[in-house]
From Swiss-Prot:
InterPro entries: Rubredoxin-like_dom (IPR024934), Rubredoxin_dom (IPR024935), Rubredoxin_ET (IPR050526). GO terms for molecular function: electron transfer activity; iron ion binding. It comes from Methanocaldococcus jannaschii (strain ATCC 43067 / DSM 2661 / JAL-1 / JCM 10045 / NBRC 100440) (Methanococcus jannaschii). Pfam families: Rubredoxin. The keyword Kinase does not apply. SUPFAM superfamilies: Rubredoxin-like. This is Probable Rubredoxin-1. Rubredoxin is a small nonheme, iron protein lacking acid-labile sulfide. Its single Fe, chelated to 4 Cys, functions as an electron acceptor and may also stabilize the conformation of the molecule. PANTHER family: RUBREDOXIN (PTHR47627), RUBREDOXIN-1-RELATED (PTHR47627:SF1).
C-alpha cells in the first residue's frame, strides 16, 4: 500500500499526491522516490512501498533491506 498525502481545498481542487522519503537506519542514505535507485534498475517516480522485497540499501549493499528504513517527514511530488 502506498501512503499518499493529498491536500484538497474547499473549492474541490487538490494538490498532487506526495510520496515519502525513507532513510536507512544503518548508514543514513535517503531513498528519494523522485530519483529511484538506478544502481538496482529502480526507475524514477517509484514510491518506497513499491520497491521489490529483494531491494537492498545501495550503500550497505546486502547488509540491510527495506525493513531497515524509516520514513522521514519529507515528501516529494511527481509531475505527470
Amino acid at each position: 500500500m502506498v501512503e499518499l498525502k493529498i491536500a484538497c481545498k474547499l473549492d474541490g481542487s487538490c494538490e498532487k499526491p506526495r510520496y515519502r522519503k525513507y532513510k536507512c537506519k544503518v548508514c543514513g542514505w535517503v531513498y528519494d522516490p523522485l530519483k529511484g535507485d538506478p544502481s538496482q534498475n529502480i526507475p524514477p517516480k517509484t514510491p518506497f512501498e513499491e520497491l521489490p522485497d529483494t531491494w537492498i540499501c545501495p550503500v550497505c549493499r546486502g547488509k540491510v533491506g527495506k525493513e531497515s528504513f524509516e520514513p522521514l517527514d519529507e515528501w516529494v511530488e511527481f509531475d505527470e
